[in-house]
């Protein structure tokens, strides 16, 4: 992942938010990367529409939708897409998987905190991720960085462009794993 780009909402006019956001996204987009837009809370719809209208490949992320996937070991289901995305990202970060983790994250304390703060629980329907409101209450801020990374990754390897795929698998650089006891893991690219 490249360093995260953050644009405060107050810099965008409400009337033109979709068009302005699309312009920002396109200006930072590299290697024809697939864009994933959060359609769970209101403001993503106009951004999604502007990108689609211009022929830019974009995927909608709706975290509240039902999930039909299971954990890698096939033992548990997910309560919703949000839980599925966070759990699958967690599985993809596992350095002990064959070949190690293909993910390298930028060194960003806020991102590290966002990715390691939410907890999971097992309920009757499967795995459930802690509600974002509870994480926000505990941290005193939103987990926007972590949400952006997890959502952008949520489409997984199936939607990597050929350019990005060749860079990932033809690079001599591998992620460096930094373990902080049993509590947390961070994956930084050097």
Feature map (PLM): residue ranges:
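Mg2+-dependent endonuclease catalytic cores in nucleic-acid-processing enzymes, primarily RNase H-like
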Residues: 1-127, 170-190
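Charge-patterned, long linear interaction tracts outside catalytic cores
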Residues: 105-167
């Amino acid at each position: 992942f490249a360093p995260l780009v953050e644009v405060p909402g107050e810099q965008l006019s409400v009337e033109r938010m979709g068009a302005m956001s699309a312009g920002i996204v396109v200006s930072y987009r590299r290697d024809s990367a697939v864009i994933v837009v959060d359609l769970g809370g209101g403001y993503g719809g106009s951004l999604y529409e502007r990108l689609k209208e211009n022929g830019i490949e974009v995927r909608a992320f709706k975290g509240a939708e039902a999930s039909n996937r299971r954990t890698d070991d096939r033992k548990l289901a997910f309560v919703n897409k949000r839980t599925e995305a966070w759990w699958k990202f967690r599985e993809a970060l596992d350095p002990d998987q064959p070949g190690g983790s293909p993910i390298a994250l930028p060194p960003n304390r806020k991102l590290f905190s966002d990715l390691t703060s939410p907890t999971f629980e097992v309920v009757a329907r499967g795995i459930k991720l802690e509600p974002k409101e509870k994480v926000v209450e505990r941290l005193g801020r939103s987990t926007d960085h972590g949400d952006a990374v997890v959502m952008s990754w949520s489409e997984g390897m199936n939607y990597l462009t050929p350019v990005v795929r060749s860079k990932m698998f033809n690079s001599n650089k591998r992620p460096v794993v930094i373990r902080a006891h049993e509590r947390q893991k961070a994956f930084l690219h050097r």
